[in-house]
Amino acid sequence: MINEIKLHYYHFSLLLIVIIVLLHFNYFLLKIKKYEFLLIEENIVEGIVVLTGDKYRISEGLSLLEKKIGNKLLISGVNSKIPLNVIKNEFPKYDELFNCCIEFDNTSSNTFENIREVYVWKLNNDINTILIVSSDYHLPRVELESNRLLLKEETHYYGVEYKSQKINIRMKKLIVEYIKYL
């Protein structure tokens, strides 16, 4: 009888844990949704920061800078093995911007280091308000990390949707990022 009660308790506890994890994952997904409907107005921020990673992040950041959403752009987390002219050559449309308004960070290798570099960049360039551009699924963790060093009211977020035709790739990225978020 006691073993049966222990077994029921074990099953109940396991079910409760699964429910809590699913509810928290749903909360994580809702946080991602909040970045989708951000309306960006001209001159809302002084600087734009792109955290490298998935496709489209850099091009989205360059497009925002071109639209005068901010005055300067930091591309953070650039692989140190990639020469910076390779990135410049990838986006010839933005040559003028590369010559005046764009800086690179190739020392950061994770989200915390990116945010630390953003903090230093803000100080060195006398920038108060920034827009951080990253993949939508990455932004909850970016926001969590940035709240340690950056003022909430001076930091805005812009989510770039990962455009994959395969739902399983999107789900894998969401689950991996959720685990990192925990």
Protein language model annotation of sequence segments:
Residues N26-L174:
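A structural signal for short, hydrophobic/glycine-enriched beta-strand patches
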